[in-house]
Design a protein with these regions (language model features):
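Polybasic low-complexity intrinsically disordered regions
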Residues: 2, 8-11, 33, 94, ...
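Short helix-capping/linker segments at secondary-structure and domain boundaries
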Residues: 54-62
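Major-groove recognition helix of helix-turn-helix-like DNA-binding domains
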Residues: 76-91
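Basic, short loop/linker segments at the boundary and entry of helix-turn-helix/winged-helix-like folds
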Residues: 17-50
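DNA-recognition alpha helix
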Residues: 62-74
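Conserved small/polar residues in nucleotide/adenosyl-binding loops
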Residues: 251-256, 260
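Short gly/pro/ser/thr-enriched loop/turn and capping motifs at secondary-structure boundaries
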Residues: 217-220
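Active-site proximal helix-loop segment of RNase H-like, two-metal nucleases, encompassing DDE(D)
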Residues: 225, 232, 242-250
Length: 260
């Protein structure tokens, strides 16, 4: 599978540079971590996970036990049990986050920011949810109330990722903006949910022109035809959200169960 080979080569090249630096960081900060030897390398674990989001499988367990273990053993001869694989996925999280950051695109002078909800369970099951009980929060999006997290993205006009951040569901969309604009230049476009005079002023100090939609109860501000056209182009980020949720299976839509 050429695509799998390409993923592995790119990830493995990254891990060869990342792992010594990460180990040095842990030593310098005094963080104690018990690194248990594994038959699978970090690059193999990351490759399997990245390929999962391109596989079309609805859940990782079926993908790993019914597909990877049965059909990819010649690619990964030292496969571990599913339970052990889950532990390895947790251990490779720092490397995955760093790899994602390495894949960020370059700014083009035009950027868009938006957020989407990541539901962890149906609203009827909130009182019984335990997995993310300490992290997930109730929030409200365009589709109503939800329980979980928010995914915030900044993208350029070519669809390249510039910044990403995950927050609890009750965090205001405007709060993480200043932490996300380090790789942004020129104009940043957002919907009317991001309207904030103070935020616009702070971004202007960093050389970023922050342009948002206007709320119905606002005094109308003049806006150029170019900026109006760019605001209408924000659908590009909605397209990415749709791909992440429905093709890459960023999360599976929680379905209601019998509340009794």
């Amino acid at each position: 599978m050429n695509n799998l080979d390409a993923i592995y080569v790119d990830v493995d090249d990254f891990c060869l540079l990342f792992e010594p630096q990460w180990l040095e960081h842990l030593i310098s900060t005094g963080e104690k971590q018990r690194i248990k030897p594994s038959r699978l390398s970090s690059s193999e674990v990351m490759t399997i996970l990245i390929a999962f989001h391109q596989s079309g499988y609805r859940d990782f367990k079926t993908y790993y036990t019914k597909f990877v273990c049965q059909y990819w053993r010649h690619y990964f001869p030292d496969l571990v049990s599913y339970t052990r694989m889950l532990k390895l996925l947790q251990a490779t999280l720092p490397a995955l986050c760093s790899y994602l950051k390495q894949r960020f695109d370059k700014p083009t002078g035009i950027a868009f920011i938006d957020s989407t909800s990541l539901k962890v369970c149906h609203n009827m099951r909130i009182p019984r949810h335990q997995v993310f009980a300490d992290e997930a929060k109730r929030g409200k999006g365009t589709m109503g109330w939800f329980y979980g997290f928010k995914l915030h993205l900044i993208m350029n006009d070519e669809g390249g990722l510039l910044a990403v951040k995950v927050t609890a569901g009750n965090v205001d969309d405007r709060k993480p903006v200043l932490d996300m604009v380090r790789n942004v230049t020129g104009s940043l476009y957002a919907d009317k949910g991001y309207v904030s005079t103070s935020l616009k002023a702070e971004l202007a100090e960093q050389g970023i022109d922050f342009i948002t939609g206007q709320r119905s109860n606002m005094k109308r501000q003049p806006i150029s035809s170019w900026d109006r056209a760019m605001l209408s182009k924000r659908f590009i980020i909605e397209t990415v959200f749709d791909q992440l949720k429905n093709i890459c299976l960023l999360y599976t839509s929680p379905s209601p169960r019998d509340p009794t």
